[in-house]
Protein backbone atom coordinates (compact mmCIF):
# COMPACT_ATOMS: atom_id res chain seq x y z
CA UNK A 1 0.00 0.00 0.00
CA UNK A 2 1.41 3.44 -0.91
CA UNK A 3 2.52 5.48 2.08
CA UNK A 4 0.23 8.39 1.17
CA UNK A 5 -2.80 6.10 0.96
CA UNK A 6 -1.93 4.60 4.34
CA UNK A 7 -1.72 8.11 5.76
CA UNK A 8 -5.12 8.96 4.28
CA UNK A 9 -6.81 5.87 5.70
CA UNK A 10 -5.25 6.47 9.12
CA UNK A 11 -6.40 10.09 9.23
CA UNK A 12 -9.15 10.67 11.85
CA UNK A 13 -11.22 12.51 9.23
CA UNK A 14 -11.42 9.50 6.94
CA UNK A 15 -14.02 7.21 8.57
CA UNK A 16 -16.84 9.79 8.69
CA UNK A 17 -15.86 11.27 5.32
CA UNK A 18 -15.76 7.84 3.69
CA UNK A 19 -19.20 7.05 5.09
CA UNK A 20 -20.58 10.37 3.81
CA UNK A 21 -19.18 9.84 0.30
CA UNK A 22 -20.55 6.30 0.15
CA UNK A 23 -23.99 7.59 1.17
CA UNK A 24 -23.96 9.89 -1.87
CA UNK A 25 -22.91 13.12 -0.20
CA UNK A 26 -21.09 15.82 -2.14
CA UNK A 27 -18.17 17.51 -0.39
CA UNK A 28 -17.82 21.16 -1.30
CA UNK A 29 -15.67 24.08 -0.26
CA UNK A 30 -17.98 24.76 2.69
CA UNK A 31 -16.61 21.66 4.40
CA UNK A 32 -13.12 23.06 4.73
CA UNK A 33 -11.32 20.20 6.48
CA UNK A 34 -12.91 17.41 4.45
CA UNK A 35 -12.41 19.26 1.17
CA UNK A 36 -8.75 20.01 1.95
CA UNK A 37 -8.23 16.35 2.89
CA UNK A 38 -9.66 15.20 -0.46
CA UNK A 39 -7.51 17.71 -2.33
CA UNK A 40 -4.39 16.44 -0.56
CA UNK A 41 -5.07 12.74 -1.11
CA UNK A 42 -7.19 12.77 -4.28
CA UNK A 43 -4.80 10.73 -6.42
CA UNK A 44 -4.47 7.95 -3.85
CA UNK A 45 -8.14 7.86 -2.90
CA UNK A 46 -9.08 7.56 -6.57
CA UNK A 47 -7.15 4.27 -6.64
CA UNK A 48 -8.72 3.21 -3.33
CA UNK A 49 -12.31 3.73 -4.50
CA UNK A 50 -11.64 2.15 -7.88
CA UNK A 51 -11.43 -1.18 -6.01
CA UNK A 52 -15.14 -0.74 -5.22
CA UNK A 53 -15.95 0.09 -8.85
CA UNK A 54 -16.72 3.72 -8.10
CA UNK A 55 -14.91 6.87 -9.22
CA UNK A 56 -13.90 9.73 -6.95
CA UNK A 57 -14.80 12.77 -9.04
CA UNK A 58 -13.75 16.37 -8.58
CA UNK A 59 -16.23 18.50 -10.52
CA UNK A 60 -15.19 21.67 -12.38
CA UNK A 61 -16.93 23.66 -9.63
CA UNK A 62 -14.58 22.08 -7.09
CA UNK A 63 -16.80 19.68 -5.15
CA UNK A 64 -16.11 15.95 -4.76
CA UNK A 65 -18.45 12.96 -5.02
CA UNK A 66 -18.41 9.25 -5.81
CA UNK A 67 -19.76 8.17 -9.19
CA UNK A 68 -20.68 4.46 -9.25
CA UNK A 69 -20.05 2.24 -12.22
CA UNK A 70 -22.57 -0.40 -13.24
CA UNK A 71 -20.56 -3.00 -11.31
CA UNK A 72 -20.27 -0.95 -8.11
CA UNK A 73 -19.94 -2.79 -4.81
CA UNK A 74 -21.53 0.09 -2.89
CA UNK A 75 -25.35 -0.04 -2.41
CA UNK A 76 -27.21 2.71 -4.22
CA UNK A 77 -30.63 4.02 -5.18
CA UNK A 78 -31.59 6.54 -7.84
CA UNK A 79 -33.35 9.77 -6.91
CA UNK A 80 -37.00 10.17 -7.84
CA UNK A 81 -38.20 12.29 -10.75
CA UNK A 82 -39.44 14.94 -8.32
CA UNK A 83 -36.09 14.94 -6.48
CA UNK A 84 -34.39 15.58 -9.81
CA UNK A 85 -36.80 18.39 -10.71
CA UNK A 86 -36.26 20.08 -7.35
CA UNK A 87 -32.52 19.80 -7.96
CA UNK A 88 -32.88 21.51 -11.35
CA UNK A 89 -34.86 24.33 -9.72
CA UNK A 90 -32.17 24.71 -7.05
CA UNK A 91 -29.55 25.04 -9.78
CA UNK A 92 -31.70 27.69 -11.49
CA UNK A 93 -31.98 29.61 -8.21
CA UNK A 94 -28.21 29.31 -7.69
CA UNK A 95 -27.72 31.07 -11.04
CA UNK A 96 -30.26 33.80 -10.26
CA UNK A 97 -29.40 37.39 -9.27
CA UNK A 98 -31.61 36.89 -6.21
CA UNK A 99 -28.96 34.60 -4.71
CA UNK A 100 -26.57 37.52 -4.34
CA UNK A 101 -29.32 39.91 -3.26
CA UNK A 102 -30.45 37.51 -0.52
CA UNK A 103 -26.90 36.63 0.60
CA UNK A 104 -27.46 33.19 -0.89
CA UNK A 105 -30.43 32.37 1.35
CA UNK A 106 -33.76 31.11 0.00
CA UNK A 107 -36.95 29.87 1.65
CA UNK A 108 -38.86 26.67 0.96
CA UNK A 109 -41.80 28.79 -0.21
CA UNK A 110 -39.59 30.55 -2.78
CA UNK A 111 -38.43 27.16 -4.02
CA UNK A 112 -42.02 25.91 -4.30
CA UNK A 113 -43.21 29.07 -6.08
CA UNK A 114 -40.35 28.86 -8.59
CA UNK A 115 -41.13 25.20 -9.21
CA UNK A 116 -44.75 26.03 -10.08
CA UNK A 117 -43.63 28.93 -12.27
CA UNK A 118 -41.15 26.96 -14.37
CA UNK A 119 -42.61 23.45 -14.42
CA UNK A 120 -45.97 22.05 -15.53
CA UNK A 121 -48.11 21.91 -12.39
CA UNK A 122 -50.35 19.17 -13.79
CA UNK A 123 -47.33 16.94 -14.42
CA UNK A 124 -45.96 17.69 -10.96
CA UNK A 125 -49.26 16.71 -9.36
CA UNK A 126 -49.21 13.44 -11.33
CA UNK A 127 -45.87 12.63 -9.69
CA UNK A 128 -47.62 12.76 -6.32
CA UNK A 129 -50.92 11.18 -7.33
CA UNK A 130 -51.41 9.65 -10.76
CA UNK A 131 -55.15 10.33 -10.48
CA UNK A 132 -54.69 13.92 -9.34
CA UNK A 133 -57.61 16.25 -10.02
CA UNK A 134 -55.68 19.36 -9.03
CA UNK A 135 -57.41 19.59 -5.67
CA UNK A 136 -56.09 21.57 -2.71
CA UNK A 137 -55.25 18.26 -1.03
CA UNK A 138 -53.14 17.22 -4.01
CA UNK A 139 -51.32 20.57 -3.93
CA UNK A 140 -50.68 20.17 -0.22
CA UNK A 141 -49.24 16.71 -0.84
CA UNK A 142 -47.03 18.13 -3.58
CA UNK A 143 -45.67 20.77 -1.23
CA UNK A 144 -44.94 18.09 1.38
CA UNK A 145 -43.15 15.98 -1.24
CA UNK A 146 -41.08 18.99 -2.30
CA UNK A 147 -40.01 19.46 1.33
CA UNK A 148 -39.04 15.80 1.48
CA UNK A 149 -37.04 16.14 -1.75
CA UNK A 150 -35.24 19.20 -0.38
CA UNK A 151 -34.35 17.30 2.78
CA UNK A 152 -33.05 14.39 0.72
CA UNK A 153 -30.90 16.76 -1.34
CA UNK A 154 -29.60 18.26 1.90
CA UNK A 155 -28.30 14.83 2.82
CA UNK A 156 -26.46 14.83 -0.50
CA UNK A 157 -24.78 18.14 0.37
CA UNK A 158 -26.80 20.25 -2.10
CA UNK A 159 -28.20 22.67 0.47
CA UNK A 160 -27.49 23.76 4.04
CA UNK A 161 -30.37 24.56 6.35
CA UNK A 162 -29.93 27.74 8.38
CA UNK A 163 -29.44 26.58 11.95
CA UNK A 164 -32.53 24.79 13.18
CA UNK A 165 -34.80 26.64 10.73
CA UNK A 166 -35.42 24.16 7.91
CA UNK A 167 -37.62 26.68 6.08
CA UNK A 168 -34.50 28.64 5.04
CA UNK A 169 -31.50 27.24 3.25
CA UNK A 170 -28.39 28.11 1.29
CA UNK A 171 -27.61 26.36 -1.98
CA UNK A 172 -24.15 24.89 -2.61
CA UNK A 173 -22.25 24.59 -5.87
CA UNK A 174 -23.01 20.84 -5.86
CA UNK A 175 -26.38 21.60 -7.50
CA UNK A 176 -24.49 21.86 -10.79
CA UNK A 177 -24.91 18.08 -10.92
CA UNK A 178 -28.39 19.09 -12.12
CA UNK A 179 -27.12 21.79 -14.47
CA UNK A 180 -27.84 22.03 -18.17
CA UNK A 181 -25.07 21.55 -20.70
CA UNK A 182 -24.27 25.14 -21.64
CA UNK A 183 -22.98 25.83 -25.15
CA UNK A 184 -20.46 28.58 -25.80
CA UNK A 185 -22.16 31.95 -25.72
CA UNK A 186 -25.32 30.63 -24.05
CA UNK A 187 -26.75 32.21 -20.93
CA UNK A 188 -26.45 29.51 -18.21
CA UNK A 189 -29.67 30.59 -16.48
CA UNK A 190 -31.68 30.51 -19.72
CA UNK A 191 -30.21 27.10 -20.56
CA UNK A 192 -31.31 25.86 -17.14
CA UNK A 193 -34.79 27.30 -17.70
CA UNK A 194 -35.06 25.36 -20.98
CA UNK A 195 -33.91 22.19 -19.24
CA UNK A 196 -36.72 22.55 -16.70
CA UNK A 197 -39.49 23.58 -19.09
CA UNK A 198 -38.67 21.06 -21.80
CA UNK A 199 -38.50 18.25 -19.26
CA UNK A 200 -35.18 17.24 -20.74
CA UNK A 201 -33.79 14.05 -19.21
CA UNK A 202 -30.40 14.16 -17.57
CA UNK A 203 -27.67 11.89 -18.94
CA UNK A 204 -27.50 8.52 -17.20
CA UNK A 205 -24.01 9.28 -15.89
CA UNK A 206 -25.41 12.28 -14.04
CA UNK A 207 -28.13 10.36 -12.19
CA UNK A 208 -27.65 11.05 -8.53
CA UNK A 209 -27.77 8.24 -6.04
CA UNK A 210 -28.22 7.83 -2.34
CA UNK A 211 -27.47 4.89 -0.10
CA UNK A 212 -30.87 3.93 1.32
CA UNK A 213 -29.33 2.39 4.42
CA UNK A 214 -28.00 5.74 5.58
CA UNK A 215 -30.74 8.05 4.36
CA UNK A 216 -32.96 7.85 7.40
CA UNK A 217 -30.13 7.58 9.90
CA UNK A 218 -27.95 10.38 8.56
CA UNK A 219 -27.44 13.01 11.29
CA UNK A 220 -28.53 16.56 10.55
CA UNK A 221 -24.95 17.72 10.18
CA UNK A 222 -25.77 19.93 7.22
CA UNK A 223 -26.94 22.85 9.35
CA UNK A 224 -25.47 26.25 9.95
CA UNK A 225 -25.74 28.31 13.06
Curated annotation (Swiss-Prot):
GO terms for cellular component: cytoplasm; nucleoid. It comes from the Bacteria. Residues 197-225 are annotated as: Disordered. Keywords: Cell cycle, Cell division, Chromosome partition, Cytoplasm, DNA condensation. Disulfide bonds: none annotated. Its main location: cytoplasm. GO terms for biological process: cell division; chromosome condensation; chromosome segregation; DNA replication. It holds the Pfam family MukE. It is found in: Cytoplasm, Nucleoid. Residues 212-225 have a biased composition (Acidic residues). Involved in chromosome condensation, segregation and cell cycle progression. May participate in facilitating chromosome segregation by condensation DNA from both sides of a centrally located replisome during cell division. Probably acts via its interaction with MukB and MukF. NCBIfam families: PRK05256.1. Belongs to the MukE family. Interacts, and probably forms a ternary complex, with MukF and MukB. The complex formation is stimulated by calcium or magnesium. HAMAP family: MukE (MF_01802). This is Chromosome partition protein MukE. It comes from Escherichia coli O157:H7. The lineage of its organism: Bacteria, Pseudomonadati, Pseudomonadota, Gammaproteobacteria, Enterobacterales. The gene is mukE.
